[in-house]
């Protein structure tokens, strides 16, 4: 293990120990889904500063609902596969002064519709998760 990875692992262990000892929560903001998988109980996924999905660590990793969450998890390289190119999410994050009127992910979304570009989605129940996506508008708890 390289020095840098060892330091990260030690800090991660320390955070978990402190959480247990003090009976507190930890808010961890990161793109490192490996750290999230090892540390978190619940996950709030943000895209361009907006919450798009909330659920347990199991639901987020095993049954992601929001297209951004799905794309994010699909972009993680697998250790059991040899690939030349990593999976990516098409497009780019909009500039802060050029956000779409509707869903911020709509221009990059494989399921995006005109409605998504024009209207902001509410928050809907999808299984045990909460998701901000019109695809789950009609689902029941």
Question: PLM ranges: what are they?
Answer:
Residues 1-9:
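Single conserved hydrophobic/aromatic residue that forms the stacking wall/gate
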Residues 10-84:
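P-loop NTP-binding/switch modules centered on Walker-like glycine-rich loops
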Residues 57-141:
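Short catalytic/signature loops enriched in Gly
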């Amino acid at each position: 293990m390289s020095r840098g990875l060892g330091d990260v692992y030690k800090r991660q262990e320390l955070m978990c120990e402190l959480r247990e000892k003090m009976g507190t929560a930890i808010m961890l903001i990161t793109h490192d889904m490996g750290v999230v998988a090892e540390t978190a109980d619940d996950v709030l996924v943000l895209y361009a500063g907006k919450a798009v999905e909330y659920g347990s660590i199991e639901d987020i990793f095993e049954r992601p609902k929001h297209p951004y969450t799905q794309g994010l998890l699909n972009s993680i390289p697998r250790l059991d596969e040899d690939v030349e190119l990593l999976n990516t999410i098409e497009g780019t994050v909009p500039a802060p002064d050029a956000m779409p009127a509707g869903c911020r992910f709509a221009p990059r979304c494989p399921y995006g519709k005109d409605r998504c570009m024009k209207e902001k989605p509410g928050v809907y129940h999808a299984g045990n998760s909460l998701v901000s996506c019109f695809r789950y508008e009609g689902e029941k708890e």
